Curated annotation (Swiss-Prot):
Superkingdom per UniProt: Eukaryota
Descriptive protein name: Small ribosomal subunit protein bS18c
PROSITE patterns linked: RIBOSOMAL_S18 (PS00057)
Quaternary assembly: Part of the 30S ribosomal subunit.
Keyword vocabulary terms for this entry: Chloroplast, Plastid, Ribonucleoprotein, Ribosomal protein, RNA-binding, rRNA-binding
Record-level GO BP terms: translation
A single Gene Ontology CC term: chloroplast
Gene: rps18
Pfam families linked to this entry: Ribosomal_S18
Subcellular location: Plastid, Chloroplast
Listed InterPro entries: Ribosomal_bS18, Ribosomal_bS18_CS, Ribosomal_bS18_sf
HAMAP family from the UniProt entry: Ribosomal_bS18
Family recorded in the similarity comment: Belongs to the bacterial ribosomal protein bS18 family.
Record organism: Arabidopsis thaliana (Mouse-ear cress)
GO molecular function terms noted in the UniProt entry: mRNA binding; rRNA binding; structural constituent of ribosome
Length: 101
């Protein structure tokens, strides 16, 4: 390969292959909360297949298991805890409001 072509070739970078999120021994089941909770967002939504890096068959089984756990009240449908937390509010000033008598 001559020098002019060598300038445009990219060097191959080594990359570390990620471990699969579901090992062969793991059983996808609605009772296996430690496994299911890895595939749910903070809001309680089911994460997509691309984010989870699982196969189509595994994603289908995960989705079914999560839905079963929700129906059986093992998982919440929504996880909006921020909605119920009260933030520190500023004290109301009553001097701005004047009532007409």
């Amino acid at each position: 390969m001559n020098k002019s072509k060598r300038l445009f070739t990219k060097s191959k970078r080594s990359f570390r292959r990620r471990l699969p999120p579901i090992q062969s021994g793991d059983r996808i089941d609605y009772r296996n909360m430690s496994l299911i909770s890895r595939f749910i967002s903070e809001q309680g939504k089911i994460l997509s297949r691309r984010v989870n890096r699982v196969t189509l068959k595994q994603q289908r089984l995960i989705t079914i298991a999560i839905k079963q756990a929700r129906i059986l009240s093992l998982l919440p449908f929504l996880n909006n805890q921020k909605q119920f937390e009260r933030s520190e509010s500023t004290p109301r000033t009553t001097s701005l409001r004047t009532r007409k008598k």
